[in-house]
């Protein structure tokens, strides 16, 4: 089994910096480190797993793009209402997903 290539969305934030450092420590390949204004759709072909720590307003688009490319997804973004999270989780259920936001 090969090591998955990570796509980190929200790389310039506090958690993004922490995740980049952890990936380096663990020698995990980061295929793309993105932030607001970067092209997630273009970066998806470079990696296997999307880790999203961006803004809650971007979560739906991140899920839609990730599902369309059949990539695994980790969502750490916070600020979603219970109703939003329920709808987004149903959409994300089409691919392997871990939702770690509160």
Language-model features, listed with the residues they occupy:
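Extreme N-terminal starter segment of soluble prokaryotic enzymes
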Residues: 2-6
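A short, Lys/Arg-enriched amphipathic alpha-helix followed by its capping loop at the start of a domain
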Residues: 21-28
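Short acidic low-complexity segments
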Residues: 34-47
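N-terminal Rossmann-like NAD(P) cofactor-binding module of classical short-chain dehydrogenase/reductase
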Residues: 50-51, 55
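Rossmann-fold NAD(P)-binding glycine/threonine-rich loop
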Residues: 63-64, 68-69, 77-100
């Amino acid at each position: 089994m090969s090591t998955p290539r990570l796509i980190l969305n929200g790389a310039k934030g506090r958690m993004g910096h922490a995740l980049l450092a952890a990936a380096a420590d663990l020698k995990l390949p980061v295929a793309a480190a993105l932030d607001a204004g970067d092209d997630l759709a273009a970066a998806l072909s470079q990696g296997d797993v999307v880790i999203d720590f961006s803004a809650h307003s971007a979560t739906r688009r991140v899920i839609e793009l990730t599902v369309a490319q059949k990539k695994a997804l980790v969502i750490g973004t916070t600020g979603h209402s219970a109703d939003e999270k329920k709808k987004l989780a149903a959409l994300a259920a089409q691919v392997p997903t871990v939702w770690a936001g509160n």
